Amino acid sequence: MSQGRLEERLTISKRELARLLKELKKWSAPATVLLSLYIPPGRPLSDVMTLLRQEYSITDNIKLKRTRQAVKRALSAAMDRLQMLTSTPPNGLVLFCGEDMSTGKFECFMFSPPEPIRVFYYRTDKRFITDFLEDMVEDNNAIGIIIVERDQATIGLLKGARLEVLKELEGFVPGKHKMGGQSQRRYERIIEQMVDEFFKKVGEEASNLLVPLAEKGVLKGVIVAGPGLAKQEFVEGNYLDYRLKKILAPELVDVAYQGLQGLKEAVMKAEKVVEAQMYRDAVNAMEEFKLHLAKGTGMIVYGEKDVEAALEMGAVKTLLIHESREDLEEWVEKAKSSGAQVIVVPESLAEAEWFLKTFGGLAGILRFRISTV
C-alpha cells in the first residue's frame, strides 16, 4: 500500500477520536506496561525507531517476567507498525499499545489525529497518556451558565450536546428578623456584606473555570440566570471578569432551580443565546420524534434498512443517531448526502438510553410519508 493511501486510512475525525479516547481511558494496568507514543509532523521515523530499539534493549532490566514480556510486546508492536510507513503523516502519528494483564487482551492503536501533534513524547505507564489529544475533541461552541442566588450558585457548561455542572456553591445569609432602628440597619449591612462576599466567591470560581476557555476561543457566551433579583445584582456589581463580561448574554434568564435541573431550564429558556447549540436541538428533535410515535402519524422511520431507504429517497428531514453507535460517521455522511439534518443524541439526554435500547439508536423524522414505513 502506498504511503498516501496508508496515511488516508490512518487519519481519524474528531468524532472517531472522541470515541477512541473514551475507550482508551478504560484501560489500566497494575504495572507500567501501557505504551503511549506521540510523533509530531516532520520527525524522522528512523529517530523514533532508534529510541524504541534502545528501550527494547533495556527491558531485560525489568525484574518481573510478566511485566518485562508485556513491555517487550508493546514495543515490538509499535516498531512493527512504524515500519509500514516511510515518513510521518502531515498531522503526526500517535500509537497506544499494550496488554490488559487481567485478560491477556492485546491492542495496538496507530492513527493520525485530526490536528497536528505538537510534542514528541514516549512513555510506558499504568494508563494510556491521552492528555495531548483532549483539546482536539473539545467542542468549539461552548456556553457558560451561571445560576446565582444570594446564598447559592451553580456554574455549568454547555459544550455541543453536553451539559455539565462544573461547580456548585453555597453561602450562609441569615433571614429577616424583627429588630428595629439602628440594630435593624446594622443587621442589614452585615447581610449585604455576606452577600457581597458570596458574589465575589462566585465570580472568582467563574473566572477559574470559564476564563481559560474564553482565552482559547472556545467559550462563545455566558448566560446568567436565577430565580430572583440576585442575578441582576450580580451582573451590575463588579463580580465578573472583564473577559466574561465581553461575551455576557444581554438578557438574564429566570429559573427556579439550581444544579443540573437549573442548567437545563436555563438552556431551554435562553433561546437566543443557545439556539445553535446541539443540546437544545436534540431535545426538540426527540420531542418531535416522540410526538409522531405517540400519534402514529407515519412521519417517522426506524430500523436500519428502512432508514437507509428513506435517506436514499430524500424523505428524511432529521436523522437522530445515538452518540455511542460505532457507525455514526457513516450515517452522518449518508444524511449529508441526502440533505437531512443530523441530530446526535447525547447520553446526557433523558431519553437517550430508551432511544438506544428501543430503536437501536437510529431513527428519522420524515419530510413526507413513504410507503416503506
Swiss-Prot record:
SMART domains associated with the record: eRF1_1
Molecular function per GO: translation release factor activity, codon specific
Keyword field contains Cytoplasm: yes
The gene coding this protein: prf1
Keyword Protein biosynthesis among record annotations: yes
Protein purpose: Directs the termination of nascent peptide synthesis (translation) in response to the termination codons UAA, UAG and UGA.
Subcellular location: Cytoplasm
Originating species: Aeropyrum pernix (strain ATCC 700893 / DSM 11879 / JCM 9820 / NBRC 100138 / K1)
Assembly notes: Heterodimer of two subunits, one of which binds GTP.
Gene3D superfamilies (UniProt xref): 3.30.1330.30, eRF1 domain 1, eRF1 domain 2
Entry-linked Pfam families: eRF1_1, eRF1_2, eRF1_3
Parts forming coiled coils: none
Family listed: Belongs to the eukaryotic release factor 1 family.
Keywords: Cytoplasm, Protein biosynthesis
GO terms under cellular component: cytoplasm
Designated name of the protein: Peptide chain release factor subunit 1
